[in-house]
Curated annotation (Swiss-Prot):
MF annotations from Gene Ontology: small ribosomal subunit rRNA binding; structural constituent of ribosome
Record flagged with keyword Manganese: no
Protein's recorded name: Small ribosomal subunit protein bS20
Any GO BP: translation
Family matches, as SUPFAM superfamilies: Ribosomal protein S20
Family recorded in the similarity comment: Belongs to the bacterial ribosomal protein bS20 family.
The keyword RNA-binding appears for this protein: yes
Length: 92
């Protein structure tokens, strides 16, 4: 346990940051999950709408350092590839 006042303050700040970051990570996962559900349901329009809503959130969390920028890019790329494949399957 922290003994000095500054260490106590830092511990309190770290816990506050940790819980806030966990909330933000959960929000990103929810946006991604919404896109995945739309893709699984083979609903192209809903998938595109969900993806459009998810991209700025994913980018913002990457900018803030909540998730790594490469992880953000990977999620966006894979989701977009799935949506593109869904569109091609619907067209064929």
């Amino acid at each position: 346990m922290a003994n000095s006042p500054s260490a106590k303050k830092r511990a309190k700040q770290a816990e506050k940051r940790r819980s806030h970051n966990a909330s933000l990570r959960s929000m990103v996962r929810t946006y991604i999950k919404n896109v995945v559900k739309a893709i699984a349901a083979k609903d192209l329009e809903l998938a595109k709408t969900a993806y459009t809503a998810a991209v700025p959130v994913i980018d913002r969390m990457a900018d803030k350092g909540i998730i790594h920028k490469n992880k953000a890019a990977r999620h966006k790329s894979r989701l977009n590839a799935h949506i593109k494949a869904l569109g091609e399957a619907a067209a064929a």
